UniProtKB/Swiss-Prot annotation:
This is 2-hydroxymuconate semialdehyde hydrolase. Its EC number is 3.7.1.9. Pathway: Aromatic compound metabolism; benzoate degradation via hydroxylation. GO terms for cellular component: membrane. It comes from Pseudomonas sp. (strain CF600). Pfam families: Abhydrolase_1. InterPro entries: AB_hydrolase_1 (IPR000073), AB_hydrolase_fold (IPR029058), AB_hydrolase_sf (IPR050266), Epox_hydrolase-like (IPR000639). Transmembrane segments: none annotated. Residues 32-262 form the AB hydrolase-1 domain.
Length: 283
């Protein structure tokens, strides 16, 4: 996709599952793949920019723009659904010759990471689900607004207020940046094709079966912001209940942007959780 010159959102390009894929790849060590959410104009860099540098100090961090998002390819005949996105994520691992990785999934990306771990358990060492989809719930007004976004500065400003608990993080400059991202050529067309109304079906389409979730063998860290208006806290309570080897961390005074509103704590929490597996592999 066409990108602003010298944009930090551009990493390197690989072909994954036949899709030209924009990818950020930094650090060394056991690989961690980070799967972004589904906000308008989203990119992997926009989602993970505040935590990738810290996590990359101790591991290889891989953050792709998923099919149809950011600066990855948008084929005219693309089908957008959970299984296609799982195939794309597995394609990223295959293209990089990575047999197994830790996964972090944010919101929509959590639903993809969860489904990947269920379908391909041998490809996943540990799992982190943050403000995650993956179980069915009545769609919130916040999520319906996000997926139903019609490009305008005012609409983007309103959405950012829904995303963040801390209103000091939201200003007109940020809203203008995210609005401009959402109207780059091809961005809104593919976004609108993903989640047309009625949108409850897309919540359900990202959900995995309870029995499959209960059968997950992976150590899993479930993270949520208590004041999240996009994905209800109850989804993470359910995931923590169903996943046998789960632990749950709830950030107070936090909306849907855990990795932004509590970036240092998020990086430390995730880093420590993954370091346990690093230590076990050495001992």
């Amino acid at each position: 996709m066409n990108a602003p010159q010298n944009s930090p959102e551009i990493g390197r390009e690989i072909i994954a599952a036949g899709i030209r894929t924009n990818l950020h790849d930094s650090g060394a060590g056991f690989p961690l793949m980070m799967i972004h959410g589904s906000g308008p104009g989203v990119t992997a860099w926009a989602n993970w920019r505040l935590v990738m540098p810290e996590l990359a100090k101790s591991r290889r961090v891989i953050a792709p723009d998923m099919l149809g998002f950011g600066y990855s390819e948008r084929p005219a005949d693309a089908q957008y659904n959970r299984d296609v996105w799982v195939d794309h994520a597995v394609g990223v691992l295959d293209a990089l010759e990575i047999e197994q990785a830790d996964l972090v999934g944010n919101s929509f990306g959590g639903g993809i990471a969860l489904a990947l771990a269920i379908r391909h358990p041998e490809r996943v060492r540990r799992l982190v689900l943050m403000g995650s989809a993956g179980v069915s719930f009545p769609i919130t007004e916040g999520l319906d607004a996000v997926w139903g976004y019609n490009p305008s500065f005012a609409e983007m400003r309103r959405l950012l207020d829904i995303f963040a608990f801390d209103r000091n993080l939201v200003n007109d400059e940020l809203a203008e940046l995210r609005y401009q991202a959402s109207i780059r050529p091809g961005f809104h067309e593919s976004f609108a094709a993903m989640f047309p109304a009625p949108r409850q079906r897309w919540v359900d389409g990202l959900a995995s079966a309870e029995a499959a979730i209960r059968a997950l063998p992976h150590e899993t860290l479930v993270i949520h912001g208590r004041e999240d208006q996009i994905i209800p806290l109850q989804t993470s309570l359910t995931l923590a209940d169903w996943i046998a080897r789960a632990q749950l961390h709830v950030f107070g005074q936090c909306g849907h942007w855990t990795q932004i509103e509590h970036a240092a704590r998020f990086a430390s929490l995730v880093g420590d959780f993954l370091a346990e597996a690093d230590a076990a592999a050495i001992s």
